[in-house]
């Protein structure tokens, strides 16, 4: 039972770190969200993104 709980905690921690690395700010300057769509598509494979504080954020 102790090993199962340790494995579960390790799985949660790894999942959180993978999700936070996969999405986020990329080094592309922008003034409108449409400028981020192509850049996000190239970086993450998904065209979902928005301009936030003059920097693209991909989802």
From Swiss-Prot:
* Pfam families referenced in this protein's UniProt entry, alphabetically: Toxin_2
Q: List the disulfide bonds.
A: 30-51, 36-56, 40-58
Q: Which InterPro entries match?
A: Scorpion_toxin-like_sf (IPR036574), Scorpion_toxinS_K_inh (IPR001947)
- Give the top-rank taxon of the lineage listed in the UniProt record for this protein: Eukaryota
One GO CC term, this protein:
extracellular region
GO MF annotations, alphabetized: ion channel inhibitor activity; potassium channel regulator activity; toxin activity
Secretion signal span: 1-22
Q: Give the site residues for Basic residue of the functional dyad.
A: 50
Show which residues form the site (Aromatic residue of the functional dyad): 59
Known tissue expression: Expressed by the venom gland.
UniProt similarity note: Belongs to the short scorpion toxin superfamily. Potassium channel inhibitor family. Alpha-KTx 16 subfamily.
What does the protein in this record do?
May play a role in blocking voltage-gated potassium channels Kv1.2/KCNA2, and Kv1.3/KCNA3. Blocks the voltage-gated potassium channel Kv1.3/KCNA3, with an IC(50) of 118.3 +-55.8 nM.
Further remarks about this protein from its record: Negative results: has no effect on rat Kv1.2/KCNA2 channel.
Domain notes for this protein: Has the structural arrangement of an alpha-helix connected to antiparallel beta-sheets by disulfide bonds (CS-alpha/beta).
Protein name stated in the entry: Potassium channel toxin alpha-KTx 16.7
Could you tell me which species this protein originates from?
A: Mesobuthus gibbosus (Mediterranean checkered scorpion)
């Amino acid at each position: 039972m102790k090993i199962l709980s340790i494995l579960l905690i390790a799985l949660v921690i790894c999942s959180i770190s993978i999700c936070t690395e996969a999405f986020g700010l990329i080094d592309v300057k922008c003034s409108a969200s449409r400028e981020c769509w192509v850049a996000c598509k190239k970086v993450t494979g998904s065209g979902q993104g928005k301009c936030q504080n003059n920097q693209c954020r991909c989802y």
